[in-house]
Design a protein with these regions (language model features):
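Active-site histidine-anchored catalytic micro-motif
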Residues: 1-134
Length: 134
């Protein structure tokens, strides 16, 4: 299995960061198999969604509706409302597995691989790409 860890700067505000180009670079020319993407953090996840046209902002707004930044959370260290960040991976999992055909990601026309990070307390994230040959 081939693997690589990249560092992604997400900043201090909730963000949806497109990492498709990095994933495409990793699988370029590797043949057929599966790309497994994993975020080794308790407060971030991965989504395969359309970016641009407002979809990434819509996802963040939906997460705000489902997981408000308020004092309802029992997990209370960090910034106010930080407990919601620890619930995020239950809705936006920290992994995705995608087909690779002839060294190219087999994504749909409008699909992108996105790191979803609502935790402004940790502006630097690691993402692990692993290629499993077919």
């Amino acid at each position: 299995m081939r693997t690589e860890v990249i560092t992604v700067q997400t900043g201090s505000r909730p963000t949806v960061r497109d990492i498709t180009a990095e994933a495409e670079r990793f699988v370029s020319g590797v043949g057929d198999g599966l790309l497994h993407v994993f975020v080794p953090h308790a407060t971030a996840g991965l989504a395969v969604i359309e970016t641009g046209a407002g979809s990434d902002d819509d996802l963040l707004r939906a997460l705000d509706d489902l997981l408000p930044t308020d004092d309802r959370w029992r997990h209370r260290h960090g910034s106010p409302g930080h407990g919601r960040d620890h619930v995020l991976p239950g809705l936006v999992p920290p992994y995705a597995t995608l087909p690779v055909i002839d060294g190219r990601l087999a994504l749909g026309t409008w699909q992108s691989i996105c790191l979803v990070d609502t935790n402004g307390d940790n502006p630097t994230r690691k993402v692990r790409f692993s290629f499993l040959p077919g």
